[in-house]
């Protein structure tokens, strides 16, 4: 019992911790029996003046109780992370800025005095563990005389036994005092004010002496002050300093804003080096702050030419400042957006080679990036490749996403991540393969599909490939195929991919990217001049546009703000040029980053108002039946955005009427359509007369659009991955008498009615009584395609069958849910094929 008594005390759940802690000493007796010794320690522990042995242990929360949870957490870790040493990244330390409820960071030193003499008849002033939660608080208030006497008695004993003392110091909560004054301040203003309110005499934070026991005197007081100073300097990682960053850096302008905070471009006052500073609000992300601090310590160990350097971190009361290397070339995704061109194969090989070097280094130090994409592959002004936006930003994004909406898109996710299996650094290899397709084609695979459906498609579909088989070399095709191996065990590592011929034969250096970077810089400068000539706001308003839009270090943003009154404000050319007719959410197709910076260089208010009026007129004219201003051959399409090139696609008049009427069934499609309609109504039917100089797309994009249009015009369909064969019930195709008395005649009335309901109703699962109020006649072209295609007729008939089952059969909850999903899949399939 003598050796187990400290452990038994640690295993018990500690009481809720008070705001102020004082000294506590635990005495153990080795001569008593186990049961009687435990009872006596609870009632009246012994004390002796001649103590010859001290045992020190660190008390941190409920260590034994949390051990089982830690084991469970370890079992859930990926294999790569399970190999990490226990102290990798730094352990949890005392955090003076955390809430009282967070117990992970509060620990001190507990001195255990072991007594080997016989039992003393003296009553000890110390009780068992519950006194930890009562006595210190009463002593701090000074409201309990008995407690004060007991403490004085303990101090006398301490003087005899020798100098020792134990304590846990927790600073007072200071967060509630400054809320009202900072409401109207900007993020930077609040952060600077927060820094200036802190004490920046050095790297140590001055502790409030009132937080310790007011009864300590003499040598004990000096010991406690020394220990206070020691704990305050070691409570924060060495990488986080308490200096005010505004005294070391000159903040130039804001580069962007995300869910975690803001990114600023700054200049080092001593070296004149340009850096990027992320300002993170701690009050919004405290639940993950311990992980963030540990991640910062590990990031300081990263030292590789292909990884963005983290130059340091600064902590105020409410803000964390992370200083990192500034990449003036922007991200690869922004480079393609600005120049409106995909990359050449030799440029892709160079970027993949450098990115693999950075990934191999990160994996060698047991670090997984988890967010490789074109927006996080950064370029310096000289063309060097850097991997950015990992570690702190990724951890913060995951923390913030717990209380915010879904951040980012899953197009780059590996199958094992989506299936929530264990994964390692090979997920970065998969993401690099998707990024290679993104660099070659301008957009990642399945870019026009809703993110939630992409999760489903990545899991069940074959791995994506390069679309143009003839344009790219065989080694490039093989490189992409190796990266996109669905089975993680068969997928090569980053170090193995460095030996692939595609990157091994690449002899180009950073100069390969110089032409693109220079062209991008010129385009941005032109955009900035155009913005200043159209609008005349302050320089601060225009400083975030143009050249700075892509400098937020790894966050993909729409690079080209609207320049003319006739332009849709959220259109990004490259992000829209490959979107095909199966787009479900037209407004979300191309913004893949975790942050969007909206430009403000719009035209004057009068032009905006007139444009809005034109858009309303054009949209109303379309949905009345036949468009007024459009000849049949020039109806704009949802994925055609070239307003300068004369239309190369001829649509039948019947199809144009069909398109305009179908647009009423989709709000997103209608928004796109009337934006383009306003443009052509102003300039007549000749689209080449418009002034949209910055919305042209390349010939390669139009070649793909022509190819897709020819598929649709020929009546063919692309494979529909989300429709299963089991959805098509045989009874729906073979039975003449369907349930509910629905009779099917030779003309396919049931199928036509089902398609009519699909065309009219935006809710595929709405009840019959609600349909029919806003019915519109089925367009002749759709009716003709339905009656001449047995496949479409079967699909429509199956839809009618499942709707009848859902509406008229008594189904259990699970069966009803399955029917709803089947109906939704069939509706999506028909809408995709018929382009509703």
From Swiss-Prot:
Cofactor: Mn(2+)
Biased composition (Polar residues): 224-238, 562-571
GO cellular component: chromosome; chromosome, centromeric region; early endosome; mitochondrion; nucleus; plasma membrane; trans-Golgi network
Binding site for ATP: 255-263, 278
PROSITE patterns per UniProt: PROTEIN_KINASE_ATP, PROTEIN_KINASE_DOM
Function: Serine/threonine-protein kinase. Regulates organ size in coordination with MOB1A by modulating cell proliferation and cell expansion, possibly by facilitating cell cycle exit. Positive regulator of the pathogen-associated molecular pattern (PAMP, e.g. flg22)-triggered immunity (PTI) signaling by stabilizing BIK1 and activating RBOHD by phosphorylation to promote the extracellular reactive oxygen species (ROS) burst involved in defense responses to bacterial infection.
Name used for this protein in its record: Serine/threonine-protein kinase 1
Gene source species: Arabidopsis thaliana (Mouse-ear cress)
